[in-house]
Amino acid sequence: MKQELHHTLLGCGFRYTPAKQMPKGILLDTKSRRKGYYVKEYSTKGGVFVIALVLWNDPHIQLPFAYILQQPEQYKGRLLPHINFGFCLCYVTQMEADWNSNDLKSTYQDVDEQIQLTLDNSVASVESGTSNDVELEGEFSAYWQSEEELYLLAKPSRKAQLKAHLVEAELSSGSIRREYVAACSEQSEELVKWLNQRKFDESSLQEVSITTHCISVKPNRLAGVNWPPSCLREVLSWLKLVDYSAHARTVTLLMAKRTKRHILLFDVEGQDELAVYLELNLDVIGKRYFGRNAARKRNINNEAALLGGKFVSANFKRLGVTRADRDTLLSRNQLRPDVGNLSQKRIALIGCGTIGGYLAELLLRSGAGCGENYFHLYDNDSFKPHNFARHSLTAHNFGLAKSIALANSLKEAVHIAQSIKGIDRQFPIQADVLSKYDIVIDATGRPPVSKRLAAVARTLIADIRPVLIHAFNDGNGRASKVLVDDGR
């Protein structure tokens, strides 16, 4: 196998280079006597790129890592599509790709062609400098090289009054885990839940919150800019180059009030969000620049030059942005906005056993109990050790009421769960009770219950009659059946 692959790569124009003969100062092992790399020069319209292939233990199922040893001088420090950290060439999305793992020759010939194509496309993207660059579609944030993480519990917008906190937790190893989390003022309960579920100390919220600015960026170009920025001056230079309106808004927001700590949240059109944490040296800026008379004409360029000064930004960090708002959490189960969102439905789940236990978790992931309307779980049985093998609950819940234990488990699963209640009794099959729900799910597996529910539901007029869903296993689990009864 090694000989076949060796000759294939040589035939593609690679030369085998022992590790000890590789250039010094690169991020590859250059000391091992047993290692070596396959190196090739690729010519593009922008110049020559030198690529080293790093082969893995099983080249059949793992494509090689492409390391950039050398690139044209004019591209150094600039954003090139598919090139990250200045040395990593992303020529394929390996976890999504498909190839004939039993044909090494064809596979590695394709790898060679794909590297050439990727480099050509990357160079063409830089030269064209368009804003709707297909080579960077949805990937712009991947080149940000974030230093810490910011989680958003609310959708970012110019109208959203976001406040951020830096939270910390000490791990069992003694190391400290840190993250920034931003939420609206009305999300205080969700924020506390978030901290508790992620094992952070609530005392972090006692610190003064960090002013968070949401800034829309509509760039006139993406590729080819100096990237990533390492200070506030470089951020402002980037904005001035690609979107002067966003540049002016950023400067205005930073100069508007005397605040030391800021998070700039950039909503880049067609891309994921980017964020920056910074601390301003207010003494350097000077009092005369704050609270300026609105009637006086301001000079954005002068203020930007001041903010970009060497001693103005005392601390600067690039933050990776992760959305954790309600819509994002539930989006996988809502391919269409008008279908699948259960957060607006009043739901009763009757039976919290084998079917009901797992069903409750799936309902939560479709929004049940995550809005203003309630999600009620009914069961008068307790969770016992013999239930463990077929239930979603754990040994921690032995002896507890199934409905209450399951409801608590759901509420602890995610911070947006807010209207979930476990009721430790049988569901009262009465017309006035049924009318309080939009959906009633029968997971008891008992035909008498199903028949009675269907009969009583039909005594209600259509406007207040819930949809009945009967779910049960048949033949000791050989088949699962679901019957949806809308009363017609």
Per-region residue spans from a language model:
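Glycine-rich adenosine-cofactor-binding loop
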Residues: 338-384
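Glycine/serine-rich phosphate-binding loop and adjoining beta1-alpha1 elements at the start
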Residues: 134, 139-345
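A structured beta-alpha segment of the ubiquitous adenosine-cofactor-binding alpha/beta core
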Residues: 406-438, 444-449
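Glycine-centered motif in EGF-like
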Residues: 73-135
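Hydrophobic/aromatic beta-strand patches that form the interior of the parallel beta-sheet core
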Residues: 263, 376-378, 423, 439-441, ...
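ADP-ribose/adenylate-binding Rossmann-like module
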Residues: 439-484
